[in-house]
């Protein structure tokens, strides 16, 4: 099971969107409120890809410079103040105890995602993490599919891009977190229209939903996994964790 981070695990979308609006105004002259909406409308992809879509005529070097500024300010102005949605710690524990293998696919830089998740006590639950330098959401899914060729994948995200990325690959089930921030709303109906098998404003009911989507008699076996290191798939196994502990004790593969 593959989780997006910003806006899905972390309640940080509003903070990040204000950073983006300020950065885009300073770099390209777009009014901040308008730039913020443009960012929200294209969220779900790496920021560099958003810039290429929003400002295709800007030189690539300039877009890279703006992206660096955004990532730096996101750390100090968003991640420094953001935390997980209230249900997330308990949810991750329930999923792990239920045998689900968990991983991260984020448009943020992997190194910063690692730090934030560690700070919030969440990194322990995830087997692997792919970030912006590892490609787009679709490319992350392709890599997960390569490592888990026979197992269905579940992508949990909060954007149209997340839903469409999941729909672009056979065998991927998409789950959506609906959101409401100032000036921007994505309803459960929006996310279902873009392909979500289930969507809500909270993920607290996700374990029960998964039991309906993946009954025990359809649970993939261990043979569905490939050997070696591995990110998350929808494959289940016996419960493996009782709670956070030393990182060295985490079993991979």
What are these regions (language model features)?
Residues 76-104, 114, 139:
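Short, acidic loop-to-helix structural element flanking the phosphoryl-transfer center
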Residues 1-86:
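N-terminal helical cap/lid subdomain that shapes the substrate entry/recognition surface
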Residues 1-3, 215-253:
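Non-catalytic pre-domain segments flanking phosphatase-related domains
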Residues 156-200:
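Acidic, Mg2+-coordinating phosphoryl-transfer loop and its flanking beta/alpha structural elements
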Residues 8, 106-108:
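Conserved phosphate-coupling serine/threonine residues in phosphotransfer and NTP-handling enzymes
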Residues 38-39, 122-137:
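A short, structured active-site edge motif that brings together acidic residues
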Residues 138-166:
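Conserved Lys-Pro-Asp/Glu-containing loop-to-beta segment of HAD-superfamily phosphomonoesterases
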């Amino acid at each position: 099971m593959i989780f997006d981070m910003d806006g899905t695990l972390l309640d940080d979308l509003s903070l990040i969107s204000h950073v983006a609006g300020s950065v885009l105004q300073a770099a390209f002259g777009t009014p901040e409120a308008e730039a913020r909406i443009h960012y929200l409308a294209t969220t779900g992809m790496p920021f560099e890809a958003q810039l290429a879509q929003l400002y295709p005529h800007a030189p690539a070097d300039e877009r890279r410079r703006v992206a660096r500024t955004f990532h730096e300010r996101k750390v100090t102005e968003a991640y420094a103040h953001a935390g997980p949605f209230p249900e997330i710690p308990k949810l991750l524990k329930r999923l792990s105890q239920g045998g689900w293998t968990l991983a991260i696919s984020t448009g943020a830089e992997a190194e910063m995602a690692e730090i934030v998740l560690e700070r919030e006590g969440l990194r322990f639950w995830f087997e692997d993490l792919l970030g912006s330098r590892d490609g787009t959401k679709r490319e992350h899914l392709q890599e997960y599919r390569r490592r888990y060729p026979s197992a269905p994948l579940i992508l949990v995200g909060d954007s149209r891009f997340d839903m469409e990325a999941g729909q672009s690959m056979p065998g991927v089930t998409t789950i959506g977190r609906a959101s409401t921030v100032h000036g921007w709303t994505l309803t459960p109906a929006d996310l279902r229209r873009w392909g979500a098998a289930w969507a809500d404003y909270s993920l607290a009911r996700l374990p029960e939903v998964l039991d309906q989507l993946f009954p025990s008699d359809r649970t993939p076996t261990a043979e569905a996994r490939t050997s070696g290191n591995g990110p998350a798939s929808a494959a289940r196994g016996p419960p493996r964790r009782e709670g956070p502990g030393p990182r060295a004790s985490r079993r991979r593969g």
